Amino acid sequence: MELPNQNELDILLDVATEAVMTAGIILQDLVGNLEKIEEKGRPGDLVTEADKKAEAAVLNILKRRVPHHQILAEESGKLGTLNSDYIWAIDPLDGTTNYAHGYPASSVSVGLLLEGIPIVGAVYNPFRKELFRGAKGSGSTLNYRPIQVSQTTELNQSLLVTGFAYDRRETKDTNYPEFCYLTHITQGVRRGGSASVDLTDVACGRLDGYWERGLSPWDIAAGIVILEEAGGKVTAYDKSPLVIESGRLLATNGHIHNNLSQALDEALPWLKNFYA
């Protein structure tokens, strides 16, 4: 994979920034004023007029500024030039359930993949007024100030975060065992409800690690590059290279990565023994 030059990366990052900030204004205007909330199929998998209006705004910007790129949008699916190596993965409202309830943990996430690898990302949380940006080889920022991951090295000193997939009512393949075990052996596990918020919280050092299953590329593309450029590490659960379409992700400050991966393997046997 040959990266764009620095000037091109800067332009692409500006595109992502314009997109998330524009959508963020829409989310701010509509919060608390939603006329219609729908379920997309599974219980708890919500979509609102805010999702749709924010996504439309992002799509308009991408179609205008990068018309020859492909787009993968949560609500609209695949759009644009489908044979392009550049794919914009967009989640116009990551944390819809939080947003619908007025809980201030949602964001707009816009990431750019090149040959399946995240190279540019912007995440804007309109409730915190926080803009995270990152580009491959260029570092990451929060409101244009450089950020880095935490220096926590011990799992028992770490604060983690996870999420529960929408299909959790339909499958036994959940992360409940890991949640219980890691709550037992760390300083705590949080459940935020927005993958992009979780990833950026690890990127800026508020949290030390994050894992989840049932994710889509638009949930994590932007957050991955922001976290990696802040010094973090992102892999599959077993530390193998991440395939972004796999839906499973382990993301940490790098220092606890091996131990957290091992703990995920230990969780189910521990839980069975705990309740034996």
What label would you give each PLM region?
Residues 1-93, 255, 262, 271-276:
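N-terminal subdomain of lithium-sensitive/metallo-dependent phosphomonoesterases centered on the IMPase/IPPase/PAP
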Residues 23, 27, 51, 62, ...:
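Residue-level signal for inorganic ion chemistry
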Residues 33, 106, 134-138, 228, ...:
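A short, compositionally biased
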Residues 39, 80-82, 101, 115, ...:
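Solvent-exposed alpha-helices and their adjacent loops that cap or buttress functional pockets
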Residues 52, 56, 75, 92-95, ...:
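Generic detector of well-ordered alpha-helical packing
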Residues 82-141:
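DPxDG-like acidic metal-binding loop motif
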Residues 116, 144-146, 239:
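Residue-level detection of beta-strand-connecting loop/turn positions
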Residues 148-276:
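An extended, acidic
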